[in-house]
Amino acid sequence: MSRRHKAEKREINPDPKFGDLVVTKFMNAIMLHGKKSVAESIVYGAFDVVEAKSKAEPIAIFHQALENVAPHVEVRSRRVGGATYQVPVDVRPERRQALAIRWLIIAARKRNETTMVDRLSGELLDASNNRGSAVKKREDTHKMADANRAFSHYRW
């Protein structure tokens, strides 16, 4: 880490359709090789499919899915006297959001549907109903933290 300058946070503009910063972050995470327009069409296409299937506001389902996937605690490795302990720590809000976005996209890419639009919409619907592999990832993380609660006094 640099001792001189603190890295500046870049300003990101809200997405054009919903005016939501989180949707823009989601698009940027989906984007591969700088192809923003492709990422935009995937996300908006998935939102259209979600709206058609659930008859609800897609942005509300998206935020519900993110909330259901975001972890509250995680484990971090801490070396104490030759032994490495998995110490449970609370997750900062920015990291919670970043992890939720990352896990949703990874889970969507692993699904079996043919197009990314279908995969993403399926994962968003599953996550908003507390199902799917992204939610399972969150549950596993929480179980790991719960199992290592005995080492919580090693926090830093």
From Swiss-Prot:
Entry GO MF terms: rRNA binding; structural constituent of ribosome; tRNA binding
GO cellular component labels: small ribosomal subunit
Any one Pfam family match given in the protein's UniProt record, by short name: Ribosomal_S7
Keyword RNA-binding: yes
PROSITE patterns for the chain: RIBOSOMAL_S7 (PS00052)
Listed Gene3D superfamilies: Ribosomal protein S7 domain
Keywords noted in UniProt: Ribonucleoprotein, Ribosomal protein, RNA-binding, rRNA-binding, tRNA-binding
Biological process terms in GO annotation: translation
Keyword Ribonucleoprotein recorded: yes
Function in brief: One of the primary rRNA binding proteins, it binds directly to 16S rRNA where it nucleates assembly of the head domain of the 30S subunit. Is located at the subunit interface close to the decoding center, probably blocks exit of the E-site tRNA.
Family stated for the protein in its record: Belongs to the universal ribosomal protein uS7 family.
NCBIfam families: rpsG_bact
Quaternary structure note: Part of the 30S ribosomal subunit. Contacts proteins S9 and S11.
The protein's name: Small ribosomal subunit protein uS7
Organism: Allorhizobium ampelinum (strain ATCC BAA-846 / DSM 112012 / S4) (Agrobacterium vitis (strain S4))
Record lineage: Bacteria, Pseudomonadati, Pseudomonadota, Alphaproteobacteria, Hyphomicrobiales
